[in-house]
Amino acid sequence: MILKYLKQFGLVLLLFSFYTSKGQNNLTYEALISEASLLHLQKDYKNAIPKLEKAFSIEKPDALNAYKAAGMYSLDENKTKAFQYLDLSLDRGWTETDQLLIDPYFDFIRNNYPEEWKAITQKSHLKEQEYEKTLLLPELRKQIIAMGIEDQKIRYSKIQTSDPAQLNELQQKINELDFKNLSTAKEILKKHGWLKMSQIGKDGAHNFWLIVQHSDQDILFQKTALHEMEKLKGTKELDMENYAFLYDRVQCNLNYKQLYGTQVNWTQNGEASGFRGILKENETDKRRTALRMLPLKIYALNYGFNYTLPTASDVAKKDKKDKEDTLNLISLAKKYCVTKEFQKVYENYNNASMILGGMTSAQNFEAAELFAKIYNQTNEEQYRSIALDFLSLNHLRGDLNLKLLLSNTAFQKFYSESRWKNIVSSL
């Protein structure tokens, strides 16, 4: 399924979003482009091409959408249109030659028209060389773009196979690459702060953001990167849409509601079912407009679902229900604790913790203490593990007090556990 493809491939929708003009005001155009973008990912060129051409009759394509059109026409084995739109894409600012060289959408024209392909890639190289002369750190840009391409290549390979052994092998490679990229990104951030567009270009900055966005295994690093991004707010050195995505990503990773509606929910079948919880959701489009982002109803089309902005009354009702559901689940958990039905305690607290923006840091600590006491009675590892989960979340939020933690005798059996040591040593 295509939406499963989207989930596994990561943030592929935004892989080249830095080429897109943020000044588009025609929502009919934007809706057509969003629908075509989904079809582009499905390789459904028969349905994508009419939508793209209809959009282009309203407004001329920017670099990204000309590039997408070229890919669709290549899949359709329409040589003339494919090269026409590739040429236009380069004229409009496409600068990633390495991505062009490996893009599987262009296999048809690459393999069947070598002379024309050589000419277009030479033009791409020249355009990129001219672009690099305008940058302060062109070599670092090359390094970062290579990291981003490698990241996407291996994820693309994963979705092309259904063999369990190959999937396991590829997942291991993805994990290793993520760790490698994370280590490199940390070094870059420490040395340069958040990289400016004048240093590595829009494409380099976007690829660096993509690596950070994928670093969910190190939320503290994501928070640090976000802090560095914030230093550039209000300048022309930062893509504010990238900022919005990382801000929302960090918020959701800390179990808070997002602000800009960039994060979506996924079903077990890999389908995007809607947006994850948004703070004051009825005001989201105002916040997005301030960053020159498209309305949520248009953005949703990229994922294949329809969306209507709720009213303030609807939001108030939803927030009230979330709070009530959280409190009810916690109350049930405490009742089951009294009757020593510890598995039900676990299930209810786990469900409460899954409500975005539901549990406060104080409630997290209370839950950690309760599960520590259950572990002290049962010695069952799942209870110590979930206690540490709640403590880790508070630590990531910056809401964990070392003195208070060490003075609580319920956690004494945790002292030899590695996760406990990591938390305590970093406070």
Please describe what each predicted stretch is.
Residues 1-30, 34-38:
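Bacterial Sec-dependent N-terminal signal peptides
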Residues 60, 94, 357-358, 399:
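Short coil turns that delineate tetratricopeptide repeat
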Residues 38, 42, 46, 60-62, ...:
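Preference for long, solvent-exposed alpha-helical segments and helix-linker "stalks"
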Residues 39, 73, 336, 371, ...:
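Residue at a conserved register position within TPR or TPR-like alpha-solenoid repeats
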Residues 30, 64-65, 327, 362:
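Start-of-helix register in tetratricopeptide repeats
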Residues 28, 35, 68-69, 332, ...:
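Structural register within alpha-helical repeat arrays
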Residues 55, 89, 352-353, 394:
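Canonical positions in the second alpha-helix
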